[in-house]
């Protein structure tokens, strides 16, 4: 056999060894006459989704194996189809084995392949908040997929905040909740400030033209730079780019990728959506067991504030952990590295098993 053929076979075998989970099925659901909390309506709101596995119903017709996983700001359900996440959770014998669970990965309003400003409405697209996004997820499940119960709700970053909201808005709909990289409190202080930097950069940019630009405004670059910064782990970044030239090179490469696909209106809407997030007053409404996971190197949710540790005591069935800084953590992005926290997911699933 030729050396090239041997090398190709070895690479293919390595790929198969990693990709043990099945490929997702993709689809779209149209939600009719969607009313936003602002009072605005859309006659049709499209929600894109990915699923793995098959729903299983009990004798009463209740779906018992559905798992909803929601993504962060600027992301989509596609971000979970990667080795660090799906490869750790969705494969045979793993915690969320797709042969056992029905895994649902939606693209939120304004994200991915779901309806968003850049589809054509631009700033005529209704302003949306996290409550609207959760409502759309609920309607996707109940109207589009026929899911009337969730075994687990989990989410990362913005999706983590959605998880807290799910527990309050639909407290009897799920068996367990796992918010990652989020806090059960209103967006404030530094977390609000970096968002304001993004919002102000776009809204005060003459090139934005009230959202009616024909080419992306330069403020999109500022927004992408801020998103790059707040998602960073300082120790990892120092190791990755220890010189001025290397820092510029890594940032420029990241910007080149994000500027090709990003849209200023989409990012503006997504960042502004967090303004209605305020789970604090209603935490006691959460009934299901909840295990919150943050990381010590998260610039968005700094552990030194003590918010998570304080607020989790208000939940009779709530627990929380902050993963220590290590060579394996990835700052705010630790939420998608399942090897860091899957032991806590195991505990939650065992605790909440019927």
PLM feature spans:
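Active-site nucleophile elbow and catalytic-triad environment of alpha/beta-hydrolase enzymes
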Residues: 266-282
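Conserved alpha/beta-hydrolase "acid-adjacent" motif
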Residues: 299-306
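Short beta-strand/loop motif that positions the catalytic acidic residue
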Residues: 286, 292-294
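Alpha/beta-hydrolase-fold enzymes
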Residues: 173-257
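N-terminal cap/lid subdomain of alpha/beta-hydrolase-fold enzymes
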Residues: 50-119
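Catalytic active-site module of serine/aspartate enzymes centered on a nucleophile-bearing elbow/loop
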Residues: 317-354
